[in-house]
Amino acid sequence: MSITYKKDEKDLKNNTNNSKKKFIAKEFQSLLCVFTALRGTQITIQLRSNCEIYGTITNVDAYLNIELSDAKLTNTRYKNKRDEHVQEILIQSRNIRFIQIPDKIDLNSLLYLYSKQLSQSKKKYERTLRKPPPPTK
């Protein structure tokens, strides 16, 4: 005995109508994809407190908090700029004023490679549909 709900029937109708629409990952709807594609590159981040941090991106989370390794912290608040070397640092997104990406980095190719990685990982976890059994006579 199968019970169908109206909600399920509506969802089925909506899925068939929207099957032609192109799927866009949530990461590509924000700047998150840019910074995750830049993982492993060296950038300069200026904070709201007028400090500059130069380091290598190791991780970026969904809230755009950036983790840098081998970072050099320059405090421009004082007359004599003091440089500090930090092994790892986590920068909260609310403290970032702007991020300087080097000119030598081609963002188009990086984003293209990153989108290929996402699609490959998506295919890896996608379920395959079973073939229907052959008809019996």
Swiss-Prot record:
SMART domains: Sm
UniProt superkingdom: Eukaryota
Protein name per Swiss-Prot or TrEMBL: Putative uncharacterized protein DDB_G0291015
CDD domains found in the cross-reference section: LSm10
A Pfam short name: LSM
Cellular compartments per GO CC: cytoplasmic U snRNP body; nuclear body
UniProt source species: Dictyostelium discoideum
GO biological process, one term: mRNA 3'-end processing by stem-loop binding and cleavage
